[in-house]
Amino acid sequence: MPKKKALAPPPYLVSIVFLPWWISLSFQKSLEPWITNWWNSRKSETFLNDIQEKGVLEKFIELEELLLLDEITKECPETQIQKLYIGIYKETIQLVKIKNEEHIHIILQISANIICFATLSGYAILCNEELVIVNSWIQEFLYNLSDTIKAFSILLVTDLCIGFHSPHGWELMIGSVYKDFGFAHNEQIISGLVSTFPVILDTILKYWIFHYLNRVSPSLVVIYHSMNE
């Protein structure tokens, strides 16, 4: 059993990290032609929510106004006006194609997320014994680290997640998740989440340090506060 315990964790850690990602990516690549064909062959050409439809209309109106303004300032004859409308039509077709590609990407990404979640759930249900071994191995590894390294690691992680420069990273990550699940970009909601998540994490961290680390390793707390100052 000790030998199994020593050899088992690394492969399981690698599989837990990479296997769900690899399975979801494989499914995504295999589903892409089918979903693309299904989407493009649908009788209804659009599948937009209200916010996305509003965004498309705004882009179309902006494009039309810019082209009209450009032609008016040139004082073009009627033939040029006809070319203008042909140009608007071509740009509209291009805009529809871009939106179709975005919708296909959203469907594929949601499918990949579901498959990844299902794979992790399968791990939790079918590989419970192996997860217990991995958990004990991680705890033993962390326990053998010195208090200085532990404090440095905590300080590094907290500075990355809730430090002065963390909002930009949170904005990119939340915006990416927001887009993956098919929601239209909303600056107010993303800004609200960016300003809320670090505060929640900071509160949880302080409670954890006060409630757990103070009881388990007071010296680690002292080193952490000294390095933080």
Curated annotation (Swiss-Prot):
The name this protein goes by in its record: Potassium/proton antiporter CemA
Keywords for this protein: Antiport, Chloroplast, Hydrogen ion transport, Ion transport, Membrane, Plastid, Plastid inner membrane, Potassium, Potassium transport, Transmembrane, Transmembrane helix, Transport
InterPro entries on file: CemA
Species: Piper cenocladum (Ant piper)
Keyword Lipid biosynthesis belongs to the record: no
Lineage top rank: taxon: Eukaryota
Membrane protein topology class: Multi-pass membrane protein
Gene Ontology MF terms: antiporter activity; proton transmembrane transporter activity
Family: Belongs to the CemA family.
Signal peptide coordinates: none
Catalytic activity reported: K(+)(in) + H(+)(out) = K(+)(out) + H(+)(in)
Single GO BP term: potassium ion transport
TM spans (from-to): 7-27, 106-126, 154-174, 189-209
Subcellular location: Plastid, Chloroplast inner membrane
Pfam families found in the cross-reference section: CemA (PF03040)
Task of the protein: Contributes to K(+)/H(+) antiport activity by supporting proton efflux to control proton extrusion and homeostasis in chloroplasts in a light-dependent manner to modulate photosynthesis. Prevents excessive induction of non-photochemical quenching (NPQ) under continuous-light conditions. Indirectly promotes efficient inorganic carbon uptake into chloroplasts.
One cellular component term from this protein's GO annotations in UniProt: chloroplast inner membrane
HAMAP family, alphabetized: CemA_PxcA (MF_01308)
